[in-house]
Amino acid sequence: MKKRIFESTDTNVKKFVFEWGDQPSEKKGVAEAVLYRYGEYRKRTVICCSVMSGCPVGCTFCGTGKFFVRNLTKNEIVEQVRSCLETIDCGTRDIEKFQIMFMSMGEPMLNWKELKLAIIELADMYPTAQLLISTSAPTGMIYHLGELISFSMQIKRLGLQFSVHESTDEARAKLIPTNTCTLRQIAAMGDTWAAFTGRKPFFNYCVNTDNNGADDARRLASLFNPDVWECTLSVICEKDESVANSINRQLDIIEGFRKAMEDEGFHLRVFNPAGQDDIGGGCGQLWYFQKWLKSNL
């Protein structure tokens, strides 16, 4: 395995790139993980890691595109986290808020077998870590919700987030062309998760010029009960747009939409776009993967 580290000028964000295939026993593949520091590592540390090399889902804004190389193994997922933590200046037990999120490259629920094993190992290695699965909710997920809930009873620090991004199924299907659950099905899964686990589900919403109106906020509130759900508003740099232009434009849009969502009763958080402008630290910006594809496939 080869490992490269790219550090943002922000100094609070590092991207880790892992390449496999230089040994006869390794299958070719590349994955990216991002390490975030909020103030100090001791205060809050977040790792976003990959579950696949590439992704078959094909979200239209994502730099991974429709390219899929292979699923990552349990060991390859765990190695991303371990490598990131080698570079911080404290032990994980000293971190006030430590989060491991499966939301960099790949759809977690399409590599559930290996991800489940990785979560078990990571929960044992890092007993203070909060773990989060972020999913687009592929169609088959609805049939495996019971298994996921049962597993979450074993791993009680496991959270669940859905990539929603639009307030109607028609608009969402254009953004995420692969078959996924409907918004009502996603809402029902999250409600069930909350009822059985006692943990609030999250939905992630990428705000753009076409989905930030009061009608969007009302539709979301009618689907996702604000008393049950938490919402994250995200700045996403589309693969063909200037990062600086994207961030400035979308942060302005988010401020207006935040008020509409708060009026509907939602408790919100806004994703910090640190590291998107120079190392591609955000979703949809996996530029090293695209470069690797040109050389290897």
Predicted regions and their residues:
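Auxiliary Fe-S-binding modules of radical SAM enzymes
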Residues: 1-28, 191-201, 205-297
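A short beta-strand motif that forms part of the nucleic acid-binding face
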Residues: 37, 53, 63-66, 237
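Cysteine-centered iron-sulfur cluster-binding motifs in ferredoxin-type domains/subunits
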Residues: 51-58
